[in-house]
């Protein structure tokens, strides 16, 4: 056997080992992913909606120059599967200079669950946390949800999060998965 043949044999052997290693790695990832998926169902507490008293909830959405996404976000919030009489959507306009405020006002006129909170002049433009703290003064609900202006939650996300918060008295806050528009 020449050196070239020996080198090719070693290279072939290394290649085969790497291929099998990658296959085994993918298999392990799949198994653990499936186990995690099954665990998530165990951890979820499904709620009998007919016998569960959902808390009132205010959704706070701070927005500063978000004209490209705010309409879709508010529409997404209005589509949430949550008792309509217990939901308030407070959109915080933090000194936007684009058409964000006009878009919000269209929703305010069409649905009484949507409320516009304009950050007072001189107090705006100082960050998301400042806008949220100012808007907290008008919240009257039992629970508060905070979404960014470019978030579109799943239809049942708020219902699930609120139920977890109420059912587990040790929790003070819950965080769900989210997806953004931009």
Q: For each of these PLM feature ranges, what is it?
A:
Residues 42-182:
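Internal catalytic domains of large membrane-associated glycosyltransferases
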Residues 1-51:
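N-terminal membrane-anchoring/stem segments of glycan-assembly enzymes
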């Amino acid at each position: 056997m020449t050196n070239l043949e020996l080198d090719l044999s070693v290279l072939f052997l290394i290649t085969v080992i790497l291929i099998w290693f990658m296959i085994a790695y993918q298999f392990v990832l799949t198994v653990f992913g499936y186990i995690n998926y099954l665990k998530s169902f165990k951890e979820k507490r499904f709620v009998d909606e007919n016998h569960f008293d959902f808390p009132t909830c205010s959704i706070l959405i701070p927005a500063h120059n978000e004209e490209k996404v705010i309409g879709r976000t508010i529409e997404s919030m209005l589509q949430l599967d949550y008792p309509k009489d217990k939901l308030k959507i407070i959109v915080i306009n933090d000194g936007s200079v684009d058409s964000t405020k006009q878009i919000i006002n269209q929703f305010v006129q069409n649905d009484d669950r949507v409320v516009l909170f304009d950050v007072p002049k001189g107090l705006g433009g100082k960050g998301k946390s400042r806008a949220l703290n100012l808007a907290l003064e008008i919240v009257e609900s039992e629970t508060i949800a905070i979404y960014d202006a470019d978030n579109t939650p799943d239809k049942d996300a708020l219902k699930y999060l609120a139920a977890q918060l109420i059912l587990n008295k040790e929790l003070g806050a819950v965080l769900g998965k989210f997806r953004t528009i931009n």
